[in-house]
């Protein structure tokens, strides 16, 4: 099956191309921290030769508690993103939660993300599709891999075929997520070769049934990322923080920022190896 290529500026995202890193921080905590984290990612990815897109949320609209930090909001968030682009020349990905956010966000960033909990909301899909932007679709935790084809088709019917699909784990009983490694191939087939990326960070979440925030298993970041890359995918989605225990959202799943370079060096070596193999077509 031919693998589709989605272009983000000069970056080619495809399952048979060198992996692209979609990474940054969970939520914009401050302008200064965003600048610090983005600068570190840019330095490391430039050194290793890894195509890179910076990720952060300007509004975490789906926090478990109404008291949890959500972010700086649309206006301030777009100002920070624009400064990051102007300073580092970096591409940006962020999520939208309402139809009204789609165009203002697409005017600034390079990829707009459809959140997992909202992936079947047709009005939101239509609004995002109309922007003409590259779209990253988070596969819902409650959806089987084969069903992503319906979301891709919905975007296509709305006039946008620049779709990336993102695996972020599936519900396994209550308060736990697992990643079915067979699902990557199913998603490729169901979407007719769309690029698949792997959100390692959020796949490591584990909820406290009585708590207002997610726990996590960041100590297993490396093994999970290696397993995903070994299936031959287009990219990784990672969140890092200089002090994960002090992060304002999803710290327990975040990669310590000082581990980024050794982590990515291993991921690049593995990805290069996997994609050097001749494809074996088994029917």
UniProtKB/Swiss-Prot annotation:
Which pathway does this chain act in?
A: Carbohydrate biosynthesis; 3-deoxy-D-manno-octulosonate biosynthesis; 3-deoxy-D-manno-octulosonate from D-ribulose 5-phosphate: step 2/3; Bacterial outer membrane biogenesis; lipopolysaccharide biosynthesis
- Give GO terms for biological process: keto-3-deoxy-D-manno-octulosonic acid biosynthetic process
Question: Quick one: a GO cellular component term?
Answer: cytoplasm
Keyword Cell cycle present in the record's keywords: the answer is no
| The organism's place on the tree of life at top rank | Bacteria
User: So where does this one cross the membrane?
Assistant: none
Enzyme class, broadest EC rank: transferase
Which InterPro entries does this one have? Aldolase_TIM (IPR013785), DAHP1/KDSA (IPR006218), KDO8P_synthase (IPR006269)
Q: Which reaction does it catalyse?
A: D-arabinose 5-phosphate + phosphoenolpyruvate + H2O = 3-deoxy-alpha-D-manno-2-octulosonate-8-phosphate + phosphate
This protein's record includes keyword Cytoplasm: yes
Localization, per the record, is: Cytoplasm
Q: Which UniProt keywords apply?
A: Cytoplasm, Lipopolysaccharide biosynthesis, Transferase
- EC no. given is 2.5.1.55
SUPFAM superfamilies named in the record? Aldolase
Query: Which GO terms label this protein's molecular function in UniProt?
Result: 3-deoxy-8-phosphooctulonate synthase activity
Q: Which NCBIfam families match?
A: KDO8P_synth, PRK05198.1, PRK12457.1
Family, as annotated: Belongs to the KdsA family.
Protein name, UniProt field: 2-dehydro-3-deoxyphosphooctonate aldolase
Q: Which organism does this record belong to?
A: Vibrio parahaemolyticus serotype O3:K6 (strain RIMD 2210633)
